[in-house]
Amino acid sequence: MADSSESFNIATSPRAGSRRDALTSSPGRDLPPFEDESEGMFGDGVVPEEEEDGEELIGDAMERDYRPISELDRYEVEGLDDEEDVEDLTASQREAAEQSMRMRDREMGRELGRMRRGLLYDSDEEEEDRPARKRRMAERAAEGAPEEDEEMIESIENLEDMKGHTVREWVSMAATRLEIYHRFKNFLRTHVDEHGHNVFKEKISDMCKENKESLPVNYEDLAAREHVLAYFLPEAPAEMLKIFDEAAKEVVLVMYPKYDRIAREIHVRISHLPLVEELRSLRQLHLNQLIRTSGVVTCCTGVLPQLSMVKYNCNKCNFILGPFFQSQNQEVRPGSCPECQSFGPFEINMEETVYQNYQRITIQESPGKVAAGRLPRSKDAILLADLVDSCKPGDEIELTGIYHNNYDGSLNTANGFPVFATVILANHITKKDDKVAVGELTDEDVKAIVALSKDERIGERIFASIAPSIYGHEDIKRGLALALFGGEAKNPGGKHKVRGDINVLLCGDPGTAKSQFLKYVEKVASRAVFTTGQGASAVGLTAYVQRHPVTKEWTLEAGALVLADRGVCLIDEFDKMNDQDRTSIHEAMEQQSISISKAGIVTSLQARCTVIAASNPIGGRYDPSLTFSENVDLTEPIVSRFDILCVVRDTVDPVQDEMLARFVVSSHIKHHPSSKDIANGDAAEFALPNTFGVEALPQEVLKKYIMYAKEKIRPKLNQMDQDKVAKMYSDLRKESMATGSIPITVRHIESMIRMAEAHARMHLRDYVVEDDVNMAIRVMLESFIDTQKFSVMRSMRKTFARYLAFRRDNNELLLFVLKQLIAEQVTYQRNRYGAQQDTIEVPEKDLVDKARQINIHNLSAFYDSDLFKMNKFTHDVKKKLIIQQF
């Protein structure tokens, strides 16, 4: 028996060798078949002589060979087990048996290969002709790799030469696939970083510790080591990734031989693909190629089981057919039963069928990247295996995958002609956050930002840079600037989350640029979603569940607050929302999450965003004789969730109105499209004067400054004056109870802390100092006093004058007091004479008395200041009058 098996191997292996040599470029490729080679090695005269004098098989003695011999006509009893019952093998037993047979055949082929090389080729000649092969064999031997298929490694010397084939055809060839397989396997084994550490040994170890099946591979590393593979990969990703997965699985099993019990497959995930395509730029030339795109997840299905390797039962004979490997494009079904030759029916064998996880998501272009007037495009993506649940609605992700097309009958019905739907088969997903944006800053940008932060008046410069095309409204600009920088979120012990975002509500008369402020923030913020209260429902703001029109499954769709995660959500016409819709954002504004429990989907989505809303008062105009809560149609729970309330009144002030008109006309002249004086529109914008009296920052610099500060600066509260905040809170509570205006709650303490952190972050400070606390108290007080009745507003300003005077020079305070005196005089003249005169006179003594109340005793500097003259005031020393001419 042993002899017969040896003769069988010797007879069959040359045929296998000749078949394998046909694929190789080895020196023996053009030689005749193996049988002919071995005959020619015994000399020219021997073979013809054997052919002539050979034994004649057909003759008279032919029947003697068929005579009965009792000893040889019986089978040997040893080794036979016919009497035992033979059971059917299970799938796992069969796989183990086939694995052992493959290993045995591999071992025998290896021994046979060594014999054949020694028989056919001279060793010296081989070393001269094939030095590369010997070097590669030595490297593999040093790595301890098995020597199987050594001939096949040399099948293609020049992988770049595709011999006129396309990349997909070239990669599909057996010899090319084997060369790619070995090159990638060698890359995984030997790639090291700049410190000499083995990169993938650590990655594989981490992957196996977490029982995962995804091995991330940096495309840039692959291109540096194996540029040919990096060239083939985007052109034929499906074929290349299949080879990569097989090579990665073998490398993993060498390190962890039994890991296939945990993960049946190992998937190579390609990251850092250099070219990023926009969703709206995907065309037919990208079909079946590896692409990288980004967007916001707007919709995702549940995790479904997808058939991976399916087996069928024949209902007539109960024979098990399969396994059939299912592809993404079509369903593979058996045609007929090989046992009973029937054509069905067949049903899926649930026990032996292998499934894999399947999830479908929809990604949409990020809100900040869509051009004005364009609708955001969206695209479906399929997540398989351990990629499922790696993202949820509202997450901004970078997606690397294969751009596929598939047949969609509903599209053909709708369009009337055959078209294909497109989908991205995901390979790698990365969640984007602010760190990615900061990575876009250059070293020069960082140096310029740090240098700017050392300017003593950087706070005023940033306030002046907010909406430079809008005149005045310093309190709104200050509040929006603090909201853009934001405070620091806290989550002590991972149990109770305290938000760090600052919410702002603008309320006031029509025509006071409320919507313009929102539009400006939309352009400056790195991620902003703009919506209106009239056009936004409760589910449009939060999230909703709907049934997919084609698949009929429930999907989770994200609303505006979820899409604005880690950004800004801008809501115009906030008062036009009905109460039911408005209450839906209570949780989003304070807990910064949205809980969903609909149609069997129970989940919680992140809504970590700043809410900036604008509303109009009841009746159209703000009535200063009423409190804030009486002027707006908003409930106390929603008002208390706003940190800063900005009340904008359209008061008649001839001097201010004239300055505003001059500013608007100047702005229109400088920003006209056909203006020849200034080529750059941004330069014209910054040339406009501002009421802060400092130079504003360019808008691009401001964006980078905010981006850097939000990501890199984490201000702490170690050195904060706690007593001052506590005293301020108790005073505000007392005044609130006395006046009956907006209620002061514990949320306002947190608001002051958030504003102090935002002011510290604005100056790139790591700790909150006293100046930050004073600015937070000033903004809080201005917000609180503006919401009072006009009758109590003046007394409250006098009560909190020392807090309101922070960061204001004496000239500003005196100008404010003088304007109040002028307004009183104008009211007196109208009531007495029925009309306002062109000249208003105020006794100097009245201004001196008011100035002493705020501890200002010397007014000469104020009389000489530009601020005094700019507002058309003159000082008559002889008459001791202050005169304003209109």
Swiss-Prot record:
Superkingdom per UniProt: Eukaryota
A GO cellular component entry from the record: nucleus
MCM domain sequence ranges: 458-665
Broad class of where this protein is predominantly found: nucleus
PTM comment, free text: May be in a phosphorylated state in the mitotic mcm complex. Phosphorylated in the interphase mcm complex. Phosphorylated by the cdc7-dbf4 and cdc7-dbf4b complexes.
Extent of Polar residues compositional bias: 1-12
Molecular function per GO: 3'-5' DNA helicase activity; ATP binding; ATP hydrolysis activity; single-stranded DNA binding; single-stranded DNA helicase activity; zinc ion binding
Record-listed E.C. numbers: 3.6.4.12
Zinc finger (C4-type): 314-340
Keyword Cell cycle: yes
UniProt catalytic activity: ATP + H2O = ADP + phosphate + H(+)
Basic and acidic residues bias (residue ranges): 95-104
Motif interval(s): Arginine finger: 640-643
Gene Ontology BP term (one): double-strand break repair via break-induced replication
InterPro entries attached to this UniProt entry: MCM, MCM2, MCM_CS, MCM_dom, MCM_lid, MCM_N, MCM_OB, NA-bd_OB-fold
Localization in the cell: Nucleus; Chromosome
Record keywords: ATP-binding, Cell cycle, Chromosome, DNA replication, DNA-binding, Helicase, Hydrolase, Metal-binding, Nucleotide-binding, Nucleus, Zinc, Zinc-finger
SUPFAM superfamilies named among the record's database cross-references: Nucleic acid-binding proteins, P-loop containing nucleoside triphosphate hydrolases
Acidic residues compositional bias, start-end: 47-58, 78-88
Family according to the record: Belongs to the MCM family.
Note: Early fractionation of eukaryotic MCM proteins yielded a variety of dimeric, trimeric and tetrameric complexes with unclear biological significance. Specifically a MCM467 subcomplex is shown to have in vitro helicase activity which is inhibited by the MCM2 subunit. The MCM2-7 hexamer is the proposed physiological active complex.
Subunit relationships: Component of the mcm2-7 complex (RLF-M). The complex forms a toroidal hexameric ring with the proposed subunit order mcm2-mcm6-mcm4-mcm7-mcm3-mcm5. Component of the replisome complex. Component of the CMG helicase complex, composed of the mcm2-7 complex, the GINS complex and cdc45.
Function as written in the Swiss-Prot or TrEMBL entry: Acts as a component of the MCM2-7 complex (MCM complex) which is the replicative helicase essential for 'once per cell cycle' DNA replication initiation and elongation in eukaryotic cells. Core component of CDC45-MCM-GINS (CMG) helicase, the molecular machine that unwinds template DNA during replication, and around which the replisome is built.
The protein, known as: DNA replication licensing factor mcm2
UniProt lineage: Eukaryota, Metazoa, Chordata, Craniata, Vertebrata
